[in-house]
Amino acid sequence: MTSQQAQVAAAVTNAAAQSAFCGDYRWVARHLKDRDAERARCNSPDGGYTAVETVHFDRAEFTKQIQEFLDADVSDGFVIGLKRRREFALQLCHDYKKFTEAQRLELVLALAVDLGVRDLALMMKTLPSIKRSGLVLNVAAAALGFSRKNDPNISKSVKRGLVPLAEQFFLLIGTIQPGPLFLLNLRVDLGILIERHREKLPKSSVEALELLDLIMRDLFATQGSMRFRRIDLSSEDLAAFVLKNERVHQVRSWADLQRRLAGQQRYCFGLFHMHMPHAPLVFVQVVVTDHLCNSITPILEEETSPVKNPSHIIFYSVSTSNTGLRGLNIASHLLFLTIQRMTSMFPQCTTAATLSPVPGFARWFKAALANGDQQSQATSDAKNVLKNKQHIDPKMRLEPPERSFFTTEQAQLLTMKYGVNQLVLHKWLLKKISDPEWHKDMELVENIRDVMTAACARYILFARKQDKILDPVANFHLQNGAQVEQINFMADTTPSALTSALGMMVNYRYCMPSIDVTSLSYKRQSLAAVSPAAARLVWPTESVILDEIERLKDERNTPLFAKVFRAGEVISARGSLPKAIYFVASGRVRVQSAHPYNLCEGQTFGERESLNDEPVAFTVRAETVTHLLLLPYNDVKALQRESSALRDYVGSDPRVWQQQLYMSFHGSKL
């Protein structure tokens, strides 16, 4: 950091400190108590709705008023008409807080069904007879190829008629001070009401409510009234909001909140609606460091001195404050704005990455371990077959062993230390990590570190739901274009993190020069970008290609891509141009040559075609559900230009190195 940049950063921090208010443990306790009470109210059986009707709401009357305000001509003049509309909207926002669940359902049904999208015939009937006939003549003349002067008033009426009245109503609500928060809360209630009453309502009404939800989402996404700014201790309201709405790492004390908002090289930024200046829609917490952080504890619990040579911008918490924002990409927008702001403040920082939770890992891993005994038996049988063979015929139809969580060395170590039979290691590990105190056994922690880290990598990259990553945090960052950079064991040992993620956290790196490519690869082809170091966790086989990528990583970031292929799916077709080099991480593929043969985990294909620019020689198809790592063709060629070692690699007989790879991998796996 230059002296000028340091002075600017210090001035910003000092200015914030001078105007900051000073809280204490009582202030924190009071706001946390309010937060817990609000959450308890929302989670109550009645959903926090008012049980007794205290304000009147009539669906038919409401529908009629909206139609009069928005669809009919107003003869009182623009100013008076606008004033009446705004007063009506303000009264609704005020009354809605007291609505019962039944009244809220009536309101959304009025908006979705009674004021929903109208067909063209109904829209035409709303036009005066003269305008209607003029429009018909215009359309007929245009259809016959004649030009006819258009009436601007007719065009305006048609345009308004094509916009649902509910959407026009939302636009009106958005212009008043409490409007945006009302719309967010209305969308929260809409989602709850759809789920509660889905089976009771007619199918057409449910579809109309779901369409209304999409209209509200898209309307909020297109509004240009967002403001990006820093959050610090200069505003008590803002500090209290962060305290109550932090979703990832709960604030535990006043000192904790101080560190996050005003600590050395700590920053917090938010996106605000112009009508909600003290309630950010989403906020992110950032720390500047000189390394890729692998634990959340030092960030949350230690007051560090300024880093002399900062190189990394670490995002350790992203919190959305309102579930009415679901389906919107506001958090992504905030991340990119924050990267832009932080790199302008610290231009020497070359790496922007997250330290993120893995909320679904514990459930997935325990379920996998519960089914692990059959995998262990299959693996043991296959290993005995491999030991008795001096040569593996590529044409041999050998069923591959199921993927185990343990290498031979790890299994032997655990057997010697704990006296557990290798065939029941999965059951043994499941029992160990089900103990709430397991993380306090330091010897156990070290002995299972590699097992847990590799398992988490498999979960992050290959656990899918309809081609999308199962883990919601991973799915969010990969859609943004980030890559899985590093898997961290025992990175968060708080009770909640141990319960949901067994202490695992992941670094997702945002490499800005290639972020568009990685984002589109995931959205269009379900390719999850992963660093070579993290890729080795799911493909722990010696590889010249991976070695060369890592050797050149300081000059060029070259991620691999993880993809799941379904059984029977064609991976590469004979005669086509090469697309990638493929690494089989799990499963089995069939090479349909004159003498067909299988490739299993630990093996590769596509090298010769990609490196030599040859067409694909044989069709390769997934025989089972198969997990692959890909190095795209363009990256292969770029790597080839910079690495002479690849020429020797591709020059060998493919069957020889396929057999060597198979033996090197399966000889060390259960």
Regions found by a protein language model. Name each.
Residues T323-G327, A573, R608, A638-Q640:
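A generic structural signal for short coil/turn motifs at secondary-structure boundaries
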Residues V584, C600, E623, L631-P632:
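A conserved hydrophobic position in a structured secondary element of the catalytic/binding core
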Residues S610, P615-R621, H627, Y633-L670:
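A small-molecule sensor/coupling module
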Residues H273-P277, V591-S593, A622:
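Short acidic, glycine-rich loop/turn motifs
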Residues T2-D547, L670:
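Extended, composition-driven regions rather than compact fold-specific motifs
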